[in-house]
Amino acid sequence: MELVTILEKTVSPDRNELEAAQKFLEQAAVENLPTFVVELSKVLANPANSQVARVAAGLQIKNPLTSRDPDVKAQYQQRWLAIDASARGEIKTYVLRTLGTESYRPSSASQCVAGIACAEITVNQWPQLIPQLVANVTDPNSTERMKESTLEAIGYICQDIDPEQLQHKSNEILTAIIQGMRKEEPSNNVRLAATNALLNSLEFTKANFDKESERHYIMQVVCEATQCPDTRVRVAALQNLVKIMSLYYQYMETYMGPALFAITVEAMKNEIDEVALQGIEFWSNVCDEEMDLAIEASEAAEQGRPPEHTSKFYAKGALQYLVPILTQTLTKQDENDDDDDWNPCKAAGVCLMLLATCCEDDIVPHVLPFIKEHIKNPDWRYRDAAVMAFGCILEGPESCQLKPLVIQAMPTLIELMKDPSVVVRDTTAWTVGRICELLPEAAINDVYLAPLLQCLIEGLGAEPRVASNVCWAFSSLAEAAYEAADVADDQEEPSSYCLSSSFEVIVQKLLETTDRPDGHQNNLRSAAYEALMEIVKNSAKDCYPAVQKTTLVIMERLQQVLQVESHIQSTSDRIQFNDLQSLLCATLQNVLRKVQHQDALQISDVVMASLLRMFQSTAGSGGVQEDALMAVSTLVEVLGAEFLKYMEAFKPFLTIGLKNYAEYQVCLAAVGLVGDLCRALQSNILPFCDEMMQFLLENLGNENVHRSVKPQILSVFGDVALAIGGEFKKYLDVVLNTLQQASQAQVDKSDYDMVDYLNELREGCIEAYTGIIQGLKGDQENVHPDVMLVQPRVEFILSFIDHIAGDEDHTDSVVACGAGLIGDLCTAFGKDVLKLVEARPMIHELLTEGRRSKTNKTKTLATWATKELRKLKNQA
């Protein structure tokens, strides 16, 4: 069968034809990829073929070159480069020849060119491509289609390739793009393709922005494009301004007054949503930049140096113009608004919040008149906008300035919780939630707390969108009430607090809310469970009877849920069922933490039975397994040594968790649980250690185990050693060799994620060494001789700490662990340590840094280690 016919059948309505065509194409790609792609490129390049065939051919060429997964993409690119150079040359010729010949948009050829370019340019191949593309755009004889598809190709290349690969070509690329963007260009399609290409190229044109004359020209062309009658070009040009503001803030002063301010403020007022959104986004970005600069300025001041970059305070200067437009935009809400639709009204709310955080007290006088004028407006849109504006400015200004305003507004807000408009009630509930979170002392006052609680309790019965915000308000209120309560010096928790009298009713109402049939809407069910967790966690002693009742309700629900499991049919039911199991597990954790030890012993059999059943039934769902492991972990915490009786029954499921490489969160939870078991069971963990140590060591050596699990495993070795003391000797050699290997890991320092990982790995190593030394040393006055087994490694351990001290990327918590380990080495090995430390002056610098830390733990450990070293010095 002819290739063209098969390609046309890839869109056939007949399922059999479609599947046969796909199967043929897949087979052809496997049998002989080079020949297959050459044939496809001929189909693509031939204008006589149908549009369907050409587009399908383009997809078949492009798809084996690109993937969203960077690892797969790299494999694809290697596979392409392995194709014989002459075949690749032929394909590239046909693909380039296609540019400008397609009568459809977007161009398939431009995507193919970009796919090949990203594979070849990175290995210094296809040097003639960029000059060829530039010529296509700048040649006066080029057609509109040629220029448009070529600029699309340039845009795709800029979007997908590592910017460093194109820096040396930035002048040529920019020449082509600016040529296509100029107002003299007759075709708006060409201008659009060029403007989109510029957006993708901004990262690597820094050298051009650094030169004043080039920068002026780029800015002129972009500003002119924002005035294009074609909305698509206008939006793309504004997107460029938004991004330029982030990347090149320091250069914008010249353009802000004469151009950018007027362009963006006009855009904000535009009737067309896409245009208005970009105008608002521009000012949101200004706020983001200026907040970063404020942080930089305060850090520089702390260190007594001038900041590298300074803020020009554009946001503060523009407040009087921006706020009226934003508050007016807040009145354009859609009554049946879907949460997922991003529109100017939502963007205006976010921009107001950012302005409040950025400009602090200065925003209040600009927003307050609007709130006062409209909070009782007969038009619901204005009432809603006023409440929204109020909620938006609660974070940023000083609380002393906001608190009197909030207290004054409280009766009105309580009244608005009963507003006829659901939109107003929703926004009011959100605003009350923000007050509870950000200015709780205004909510927890003698005058308004009772009516506020009453209206919130009633609000739990409202529409899901309102009730969901009410749940969030309860979460914040519970935490604030607990923190505001008086606690006797010798007590951990308050005997009573301001929610005590309503506690039982609130809990009862929240439990009812979790059971609402419409609980899946607006995330209501999980919001209600989270509120329940917060309120139980933050309860006073006199609320304990209600906590006991809640515990029984949650246990009963868990049992009910497990009974329904066998009747589940559909996938959507299964998802809801798993979510419910996870929520119940999380709630169970919270109530267990509050339950007194005696009560915990009475219910632990039933709890454990439910959790074991859950492990049996949820082998397929990692999320639920993780939550169930966390619940077991809490039970271990509450029961302590009494958990031993469940170990035999639980061990198989712990093993499954430790072996779950595919879902690393489950594996992480299982590893963490091993540490909890060691702390709770102490030496009673011994009979289970051989097996657990075997799995942990296997995981460390296994390529398929996610890297984030490995630092935790190292740390758990320390927990095992602390629990079993001298019995750890049998694992000592293999563990010390593993630690020696792990502590020598190197990473790419330009990759922040890897730098974080390296710090975690080092912390894990130090925690392991600490646990081993403390475990073997014993906690008696006299050091147990077993610890001398570590003596040969002491020099290596100190060199490791010295190496960390010299690495400027070390974190505060690594300093804390390192200091603790130095102190332990001193107490275990005495004067030998002193000589080794003296030979490594960086260690003293590390301890000095620790003593100056803002974190108490780090300060305490560093001071202790310094004292231990001083003791040894005095003895010597």
Curated annotation (Swiss-Prot):
Disulfide bonds: none
GO molecular function: nuclear import signal receptor activity; nuclear localization sequence binding; small GTPase binding
First-listed, main subcellular location of the protein, grouped into a coarse class: cytoplasm
Region (Ran-GTP binding): 334-419
Signal peptide as annotated in the record: none
Any one biological process term the GO annotation gives: protein import into nucleus
GO cellular component: cytoplasm; cytosol; nuclear envelope; nucleus
Keyword Translocase among record annotations: no
InterPro entries reported in the protein's UniProt record: ARM-like, ARM-type_fold, Armadillo, HEAT_type_2, Importin-beta_N, Importin_beta
Pfam families noted in UniProt: HEAT_EZ (PF13513), IBN_N (PF03810)
Locations listed in the record: Cytoplasm; Nucleus envelope
Gene3D superfamilies on file: Leucine-rich Repeat Variant (1.25.10.10)
Stretch list, region IAB-binding: 329-342
HEAT repeat boundaries on the chain: 2-31, 33-65, 85-123, 129-160, 170-202, 212-247, 253-302, 314-360, 364-394, 402-438, 449-485, 500-537, 544-592, 600-639, 644-681, 686-724, 732-776, 786-829, 831-873
Record keywords: Cytoplasm, Nucleus, Protein transport, Repeat, Transport
Importin N-terminal domain ranges (all copies): 21-101
Role played: Required for nuclear protein import and mediates docking of import substrate to distinct nucleoporins.
UniProt subunit comment: Forms a complex with an importin alpha subunit.
Family affiliation: Belongs to the importin beta family. Importin beta-1 subfamily.
Protein name per UniProt: Importin subunit beta
